[in-house]
Amino acid sequence: MQLIKALKGHTDRAWAASVHPNLPLLATCSGDKTVRIYNTNNWELVTTITEGHNRSVRSVAWKPSGSSPSLALGSFDSTVSIWGKEDDEWQFLAAIEGHENEVKGVSWSCDGQLLATCSRDKSIWVWEADDMNDEFECISVLQDHTQDVKHVAWHPSEMVFASASYDDTVRLWREDDDDWICVADLGGHESTVWGCAFEPSEGSDLRLVSCSDDKTCIVWKKEGQVGGTGDHSGIRPAFRADPLSEEWIQQATLPEAHTRAIYSVAWNKNGRIASTGADGKLVVYKENGPGQWVVESEVENAHGVYEVNDVVWLDDKLVTSGDDGVVNIWEV
């Protein structure tokens, strides 16, 4: 991997980044309470959002639909704000309140109609957005996790999302009779689960990767699907909660590559997984056969001596956000 651009400008740690699915836009968020938006064609700064939050902006997510770009920001001030571009100006559209503590993650459904938010208050809220992005109605409050919820991630093409928690589990959620329910409780990690990401594939095969404080990444597969080794001996299924629940198995554990907590994981359309974390390493894995993963490349000290908080794919490039306040772009 080769570093091709270092985006500097944040004055505190860079927490996360979000790549717009259709437009050449990258948003980064920081402990300096701001969000910076870049044009990914030339890496020029488009705008900086400096208002709306009085504590760290911990998470950022582009809405995947709509006639003009808009994004959600989740903050340690316990609120979520919605921003959008109107008449060539970036404007504040809505404030979403409900969580009692820091908002750790925000994620949009594939159709852009729903927004999931998660918090240190152990809850996940699901919000329904109107077409103008200025009215948000809470349609479900999910309190199955027993600890801080670190991350939420929707599937890129299906109406299902996953959550990762300090309670060492990943949970899968689907809609049922106008409410959202937990359909799987994945309990394979031995410590905090910091992040998770779905495989961005079409069709029936559902897979998810999760990363943890236990220094491992686990690939999960929805049971009953075609593929895999066919031998699940020694692989325990996830706990099944109720008759509507789904059974997921641990298909693989990625090769050990990290020496400290793994904070973030990302899966791209070409089948590669990237991970990063407290040891400052950036690692890319590829799958040689069903459930057979190898390390393809890695970078030590991707942000110098600093921890790396987040990794996302930008086509075949990688975007990492570090405690040094820098957002790095990597050619893989």
Curated annotation (Swiss-Prot):
Please name the InterPro entries in this protein's record.
CIAO1/Cia1, G-protein_beta_WD-40_rep, WD40/YVTN_repeat-like_dom_sf, WD40_repeat_CS, WD40_repeat_dom_sf, WD40_rpt
Q: CDD domains given for it?
A: WD40
Q: Name one GO biological process term.
A: iron-sulfur cluster assembly
Q: Does the keyword Nucleus apply?
A: yes
Tell me where it resides. Answer: Cytoplasm; Nucleus
Q: Which GO terms describe its cellular component?
A: cytosolic [4Fe-4S] assembly targeting complex; nucleus
* Keyword Kinase part of the UniProt annotation: no
Q: Where are the WD repeats?
A: 9-48, 52-93, 98-137, 144-183, 188-230, 257-295, 302-332
Task: List keywords of the entry alphabetically.
Answer: Cytoplasm, Nucleus, Repeat, WD repeat
Per the entry, what this protein does is: Essential component of the cytosolic iron-sulfur (Fe/S) protein assembly machinery. Required for the maturation of extramitochondrial Fe/S proteins.
Protein family per UniProt: Belongs to the WD repeat CIA1 family.
Self-association or partners: how does it assemble? Interacts with NAR1.
User: Could you identify this protein by its name?
Assistant: Probable cytosolic iron-sulfur protein assembly protein 1
Q: Which organism is it from?
A: Yarrowia lipolytica (strain CLIB 122 / E 150) (Yeast)
The gene that this protein is the product of is CIA1
